[in-house]
Amino acid sequence: CLTDSVTRACDALGPDHPDTLASRNSLAGAYRDAGRLDKAIALYEQNLEDSIRVLGTDHPSTLTSRFNLASAYRAAGRLEEAIPLYEQVVAGRSRVLGPDHRSTLTARDDLAATYWEAGRLDEAITLKKQILADAMRIMGPDSPGASTARLNLAATYRDAGRLDEAVNVHQQ
């Protein structure tokens, strides 16, 4: 049981040990997966606060904690709380891991999707255009990643009522 694992880690290693933080993050993920978003969010919030204090703002584990909290906020429909966290994750992962790292690209894609869900279509389009250009550069224009990015951009243009641009993206 994950709650036992967190308790054991806390007792053996202390509440601020990186393994204890990782165990708490896993427990929060289990709560999220079980649909218990309130418990997940509370645990993610505490874990992020502790990770920043113990590991620092740009530590990869802290960036993961921030990403997980943003994802939980998004799942709970708390989009305006998720967006600044995703923006911080994108900036941090770009600095720490590089702009082309898979984790950075994942965060950018989730940020773009959250912009879209929040009705911030212009911001979603701008970011999705960058994602498509990067996917074509990194993976190749005919790669599955570029195809997915192309479809996502076209759908966002469609939702924004920019149908000619949606068709043009599909025809690329």
Feature names for model-found ranges:
Residues 1-172:
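Intrinsic-disorder-linked linear interaction elements in eukaryotic regulatory proteins
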